Design a protein with these regions (language model features):
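Auxiliary Fe-S-binding modules of radical SAM enzymes
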Residues: 115, 129-272
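Conserved Radical SAM active-site core
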Residues: 1-118, 128-157
């Protein structure tokens, strides 16, 4: 996404933080492409876990193409060092339409199950497409039906893995459910929200916390007006919660505004 940033912003926003130390300290996802065997052994020696890995695919040739790095395929072997060293990991697959979806996604999930249970979770999230894509690979956003297919694939593998390991392992980012216009899974499916900051389970946690707080409220009168701003995907859900609050408190008016993203482009439909 850094290659899709608008020009003229502060320098730190263009910094590609592919650093295992930041993965350990801040949860960054790393590709392992710039790490030596010595670096990997240091992670094992000092127990710098969990390490968050951006896989994208387990197809070595395709990974080289996606990351524009001729060592990207070979870098996948470094996961074996972490696994053999007993290091806990989380992973992500940024899905690109027509590139690493479909059969490639099936292959990636199947390959990554060999690292269970040390690879605790893998999220599948759609690639973000800003309006600043000059010179980049021509990608298109996923359709509603394609989002449904991604969900079906993930849920199929969740059932397989859960039957053997008791965890769901592979998780769909919230955006897939919003795009497919399906309800997000129940809390139990998120295995303790291991990838919350990666956009996996945020809506379910919000819904549950809202209902928990709502159940404690007493009916009353509040002559207030409140404004909420959000982006396209979450808008109907926040609007639904706002209406429920208006029914609870007579006189309360909640205005929910759906904001079009002109800064990054209209195809960026999430807010954080």
């Amino acid at each position: 996404f850094i290659d899709q940033m608008p020009p003229g912003m502060r320098d730190t926003l263009y910094f590609k933080d592919d650093d295992s130390r930041l993965s350990f300290l801040q949860g960054n996802y790393v590709t392992l492409t710039n790490m030596s065997e010595k670096d990997m052994n240091r992670i094992v020696r000092y127990r710098l876990e969990p390490i968050n890995i951006s896989f994208q695919t387990t197809n070595p040739e395709l990974r080289c193409k996606m990351l524009h790095n001729r060592f990207a395929g070979e870098a996948l072997k470094k996961v074996d060092i972490l696994y053999q060293g007993g290091i806990e990991m989380n992973g992500q697959i940024v899905l690109c339409r027509g590139v690493n979806d479909g059969e490639e996604l099936e292959r990636s999930i199947r390959d990554l199950t060999q690292y269970l249970p040390l690879l605790r979770s893998v999220s599948v999230v759609p690639v973000g497409l800003s309006k600043y894509r000059d010179g980049l690979y021509p990608l298109e956003p996923f359709t509603k039906e394609e989002a449904k297919e991604v969900i079906r694939t993930i849920e199929k593998w969740q059932k397989k893995v859960y039957a053997e390991y008791g965890i769901h392992f592979i998780h769909a980012g919230d955006e897939w459910y919003l795009l497919a216009e399906e309800e997000v899974p129940e809390e139990e499916r998120y295995d303790g929200y291991l990838q919350l900051e990666n956009g996996v389970g945020m809506l379910r946690l919000l819904f549950n916390e809202f209902e928990e707080g709502y159940a404690k409220l007493e009916d009353g009168v509040h002559q207030e007006e409140i404004s909420l701003a959000t982006a396209k995907l979450a808008y109907p859900y926040l609007e639904r919660m706002a209406k429920k609050m208006e029914e609870k408190y007579k006189g309360l008016k909640v205005h929910t505004y759906c904001i079009r993203n002109d800064f990054f482009g209209e195809r960026i439909t999430v807010s954080g």
